[in-house]
A protein has these predicted regions:
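Alpha-helical transmembrane segments and immediately membrane-proximal extracytoplasmic
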Residues: 1-407
Length: 407
């Protein structure tokens, strides 16, 4: 009579224990990573000459992957591939490799982020545990999803969205509910560890109060569709640059070296220093109602940075791109610029990652629940127009956005 409930309870307890371990590891590594990137950003800002190291930084990053991490340049796509295929273990060396090269990329001034790197660091530190425990392929997939949740929730300060992101990101059109409990536990534990260590997250402005009306409904819906096209443009441009480098530059270390030279020329010649790194000041300025930034510049520099092989991630640059695009759109339609900037940040991210639920939750956790309806509408609209291939090209398509189920 009680055999089945007891078996289920033991199964859940086992995964809760695994998730706590993953969450603690993820939180500790994310805390160190946040502090390191804060140092690298402050050092670059205080010493403007660091921009001249972009080419040599690119060479170091490329050589590190070529000689120490061949095959690991797939980044977060490696993790998603392994969730589906179980063909190879995520090696531990990816954690220090991504950590080091991300810090170098930010120190020199590449337009990159941190969330993608944090996922790889967490997975690199935890997948060897799965190997040591002898987990079967199905359980190992759950552990990788748990690591993604722990990494995202702890690095971004969004424990609910971090868990949902991990459940949503590996397949377009399907959520892995079997990983629900460990994903939430790991994400919340990782976030708690970072908080407990006294590491500060970026403080974002809260979305202004908006009265829902037919006017705001069509404006947000239209902008969501535009945000999806912006996301699609970023994805296609990054893929084009990556393909161009692969076709014409055989020696991998030369790719980020060339990327560094291009970035150096563009940034210095055009006066685009504000678009280096995370570009938090530009993002926050837009979210406070300013229209001084150009989203197309951030999009271009990020596509070059990532496409040529620098390391870090796309999430925060996409938030910045979306915020700047939202401010421009809000000004054009005569709307509240701050509202459109905040909504734009999560909408462009939703389109680029194919994770509309997680991105709507990111909006709620970072910018306040008062914008829940706006975030939901914009993220769904962006998801609809951004295509099936996002920044994580290893995503499987379980259901087309037209509604057709494939698997």
């Amino acid at each position: 009579m009680f055999q089945e409930p007891l078996t289920r309870a033991r199964h859940v307890a086992r995964w809760v224990a695994f998730a706590i371990v993953v969450g603690v590891i993820s939180g500790l590594l994310s805390a160190a990573f946040i502090e390191s990137l804060t140092w690298s950003t402050n050092t670059r800002v205080d010493n403007s000459w660091f921009i001249w190291t972009l080419p040599i930084a690119g060479l170091i990053v490329g050589a590190s992957y070529h000689y120490l991490g061949r095959g690991l340049e797939r980044g977060s796509n490696l993790l998603i591939d392994e969730i589906h295929s179980h063909s190879e273990w995520v090696p531990f060396r990816i954690a220090p490799l991504v950590f080091m090269t991300s810090v170098i990329s930010h120190l020199a001034g590449g337009s990159t982020g941190r969330e993608g790197a944090a996922l790889q660091i967490a997975a690199g530190a935890t997948d060897p545990i799965s190997k040591r425990l002898g987990l079967n392929p199905g359980d190992r997939s759950l552990m990788l999803i748990t690591a993604i949740a722990g990494g995202f929730g702890s690095i971004a300060g969004v424990p609910i969205a971090g868990a949902v992101f991990a459940l949503e990101v590996q397949r377009v059109g399907r959520i892995r509910y079997e990983a629900l409990v460990p994903a939430f536990v790991a994400s919340f534990v990782g976030h708690a560890v970072v908080r407990g260590l006294g590491v500060n997250y970026t403080i974002y402005p809260q979305i202004p109060d908006v009265t829902w009306s037919p006017t705001i409904a069509w404006q947000i819906s239209l902008f969501g569709l535009v945000a999806g096209l912006i996301a699609l443009t970023f994805v296609r441009l990054t893929q084009f640059i990556r393909g161009l480098m692969k076709k014409h530059v055989a020696w991998y270390p030369a790719r980020p070296l060339i990327g560094g030279i291009i970035l150096l020329v563009l940034i210095t010649a055009c006066g685009w220093r504000d678009y280096q790194g995370f570009s938090f000041p530009l993002m926050l300025s837009a979210m406070n109602g300013a229209t001084s930034g150009h989203f197309e510049v951030k999009l271009l520099l990020t596509a070059i940075t990532i496409g040529t092989g620098f390391v870090g991630g796309e999430v925060i640059p996409l938030l910045t791109t979306g915020a700047l695009a939202g401010a421009t759109f809000g000004s054009f339609v005569g709307g509240n610029i701050a509202v459109f900037a905040i909504v734009g940040a999560v909408a462009v991210l939703a389109g680029a990652t194919n994770t509309p639920l997680a991105c709507a939750l990111i909006g709620i956790e970072l910018f306040g629940g008062g914008g829940a309806m706006l975030f939901a509408v914009a993220c769904v609209a962006a998801y609809a127009t951004s295509g099936h291939t996002g920044i994580y090209h290893a995503q499987k398509v379980s259901a087309h956005k037209s509604g057709e189920v494939t698997s």
